[in-house]
Amino acid sequence: MAKDGRPSNLPLLYNPLLNCIFNNPNHSRAPYKQIIHELASRHTDFTIIVPPSSLLHNSYDPESLKSSSKIALHDLAYHNEEFIRSHIVKTGSNSHAFLAPVAKVQSAIYNTICGKQILVKNGMIFTGKGFRRSLRAKITDIGYFDSFCDYFPSGSKFMLIYIDNSLYGSSDHPEPALEASPKAQQAKIKRPDQVPTESITFERLLRNFPLLSKSVSDPFYQLFHHNNYQFRVLRTNTHKKLSVIKSEFDNMLEEAYQIISNSVKSDSPDGEQTNNLLHQILRSYPELDLNKLVHEYVEINLYDKLWAQLIFQFSANAGLADPDATKIFTAEKYDELSCLSLNQLDIPVDEPWLLNDLLLRVYNAIIELSKLADATIIESSSKLKIISNTISILTENSNSSLMIDADTLIGLLIMVVVHSKIDFIEAHLYYIKNFMYGTISDDGYLSFIISSFDAVFFHLSHPDEPQYADMKESSQKNFEFWSLIRSHKVDEITALLEETDKLYGDKLPHNHFLKARNINGESALMLAIRSKNYDTFLLLLSRNPNWFSIEDILFDRNTTTSQNLLMVSLMEETKIITKILIEILGSCTLEEQIAYINSTDYSGRSVGHYLFHDYELINEVGHLVNWELKDHNSYTPLFNICRCYDHYAYYDLIKTAFSAVMSPNFNFKKHTDKYGNSILHILLKGIDQSGLLKADKNINVNCTNSKCLTPLTVYVKYGRIENLISLLQDKRLEFMFEDKKNFFNIFDYVAFSSRKQGDNDRGNSEEITSFIYSHYFKHFIPLKCTTVAFNAKFDTTKKDWIVYFHGNQNIILGLDSIKQSHHSFKLKNPHSLIPDVEKVWLNYPANGSVAPIFAKFRMNRLLENLNIFLVCLSMHPNFDTAPHETLGLSSSGNSSSLDQMKEVIGKQESSSKVTPHQLAEIETFLSLSKENLLGTLSTTIKFNKLMTVMNIKMGDLNTIREDSLYSAKMLCDMTPSIKTNYHTPDYGYRTMFQYFIWVELTLIEIIRNVNKVLGRITDWRQCHDRVLSLAGELRKYEDKRHELGTDEHSNSSWFGNIIENKRTRYKKLVLLHSEETKKLGLLSNEIKISHEDIAAEMSHYLMFRSKLIPFAIKQFTRVATTGLNRNGLHVLQ
């Protein structure tokens, strides 16, 4: 023993709690004795809560941190009975669990074996009554632990729930209390001074302070009432000067201020209290301007009337009462300038990349300014904020070195106003200048904003000015030229270009319509592509090559979508134009080509994302594409290509794309979308053409998406037969993979798919089902096992699991019926090496309840156990033809248990004699066989323990390696992956153990039968001795009978009584001798039949073992090699 009490002579398990329970040499001593006894007696009624191994090794009990000596959690796990009992939960049928009434919510309250309570709900465990603190721990995994110790039943499995913390908490993983105290809750409530000043309005003050509302509500109601004759001017639609409207508003504002003043006068009701209240508010918010709040309150209540008056005045151009109410931007003017381009406004920007920047600013500014037309914008401050934001968008310098001067700003603002097409924009500006709180002239920036808009209005208010005429003419020329492109009028375009060439030659003016771009930033070249006008596109490029420089072409893009010419050409599928653009791109440097191809649009997509429109282009530009670049949906170009399910040449598309992508540096994980789908998940067909499965590394064929679907389950779910066939042949495939969320396996998805398929898809579904079942029978089941269990569901009416069998016969049976058939078989064949029902179903007792999260997982293991049972039956010589009949899986009915017992008894009562010599031979044979079987059993038990421990230690090794990598990343200031606490996976040893345990169970069964017969032999000898003794006594009576024969008719009464007593004694001896002789005959018959049966079963055992062990090794090799292939270790030399 080590100093700390832990065993030093056994292979320690890395998790201290599991090591204490399953690998404890002191299990028969306190404090472990009672715990071990409870677990051993009803191991299926308990579930062990397992904290992370690293946490137990490296953390302390939080309660001990305040004391002078800290207590490590691993010491509690080894020595503290309460800690151990607190992590063992009663989940059996007698655990008194309170389940949630809603089935979708997996929640239940359970008691630990020390009387504490936990709540299991929605993947979390919450500590409750009895625990020192209210904590919560996340459930990270569940599983079964195969026991290998001698003090638990052989082959027993214990349910484990893995969590991310201990139920005592830990020093490295602090958890807050579930419910805050009332004081803490009160502290979270915002105090008045925490309310932002900007969010305070006068209306809010009225709601929050009833005293203030009581003082001013009635006067304000009268002020804003429609019958208020004093301000009737605002309610009559007559032509009037704008100053009159402004004056009426000012008067109402003064009335509002007076209402506030009157409310705080000492002679008014509650005046003093109202005054004190307002002073208290102002002290709490020193930055609050009460006059501003009142102004905004009046403005909100009068907005509808004010705005209606302004609209009426600005609409009456024929009978204007005020020159300031002139409507400049009419619908006609907007139409006249609708095609105006930025290059035609004397903006000193020639570089195409800077022009793109300005066009994008204009587009964003148009969106912002268009908010003025929103009917919910009813305050001058909101309107001012909109035009202020518009100016800020145009002048921002965050991503550009371009400086915007005043003249440039006016030009940009003209574009914004003209293309936003806001009706009555003049009224909006007038409202801002005349109805806002304060004076604009006091703020220099606001004055600059307003003056900028005034300048735009001035420039566009004089249609007779040459500047406006030029803009109108330019807009008209743009419209006519773009219309020619869209209508494919090549002859007219040719004549127009010839005329332009004669007029300007190589040097086009900056404001020429050939260089014009619409509000989306689309040039004539872009419009030609959009309209699929190849002739015009070629004509524009070839008429005079000096008109469009290489920079003009490379930076020609739709500024709203950021799509360049090549992207649009691919989208429009204009292959000839695409080819021309590729030729032009070939004249650039390699760096320029890569930058152009991988520049992204508004959705984050590059040219590579659109190559599926012309997949032959991949061979030319594939080497330039960044295939790992993700768009906003996390699609890489390769991922996007694979999703083109309706492509006319999908196979060629996939083959071409993967031939360009696949290389030794190909990273499979990079091509995953935000839902966790890999390329294998979304590939419709052509998996062989892709060559993905031929890659030696980086390909995880078992990866799951956010819905816990693997590529295999996706192919089954969506009927992708071609991919399914190819994937089933891959050595890395985990065919029986179960997701960690619902524990569905491939057979569940086959069942789901079969139920969802309609009549048209039924043939496809049946074909998929056939492939899945055939693969399972080929790789997981021996040839002679023709029927296995695939699915099950719980029947609430029968309170039993209904099992679905598939094979030569498709049968549905209840689990209880299967167990009864097994029991009947054992009654009929008491000496069969097939174990008893209790041994086979040791871990799955009848009516055994488990935690809700364990239900599906436990059912999967039960089906697994049932199939292994069927496999073992198929390897028994007596069941070569139909092993499934043993469990009642045949069409013929089984006889009852009573009939089976009568048949066995009748067989045993048949006459048969065994001589002592024969008996000695039988005894010698059985004794020698028992000795050999015990030696084999001892070796088998050791081997099974080794298999179990080996699988656990492999998991421990992997856990230690992950913990080491986590610590190393923390030391290197890297972002480590989240530490996990998962169930030990199967490294192949668990699979081998599941079959080798049957060798152990059959040996135990044969030895038990041998011991039973040896006991019968002892009974036979004792009975034989009694028969000989009784026969000797009978001979003595018969000899004395002749001596007493002469006195038989004596009249002496006393002498006659003696003779009568001897006769009675003689009769009793005869009867006793007859009974013992009959019993001896039965024993002889039973021993002979049992001997023959056991001898046959020993022969069957040798044949059974010779078949089972190679099959078990084959399954071990399959699981182990699958893991090696999955991890890429098969390439190591």
Swiss-Prot record:
This is UPF0507 protein PGUG_02975. GO terms for molecular function: guanyl-nucleotide exchange factor activity; SNARE binding. Residues 324-469 form the VPS9 domain. InterPro entries: Ankyrin_rpt-contain_sf, UPF0507/Ank_repeat_27, VPS9, VPS9_dom_sf. Pfam families: VPS9 (PF02204). Belongs to the UPF0507 family. One of its GO terms (biological process) is early endosome to late endosome transport. It comes from Meyerozyma guilliermondii (strain ATCC 6260 / CBS 566 / DSM 6381 / JCM 1539 / NBRC 10279 / NRRL Y-324). One of its GO terms (cellular component) is plasma membrane. Gene3D superfamilies: Ankyrin repeat-containing domain, VPS9 domain. PROSITE patterns: VPS9 (PS51205). SUPFAM superfamilies: Ankyrin repeat, VPS9 domain.
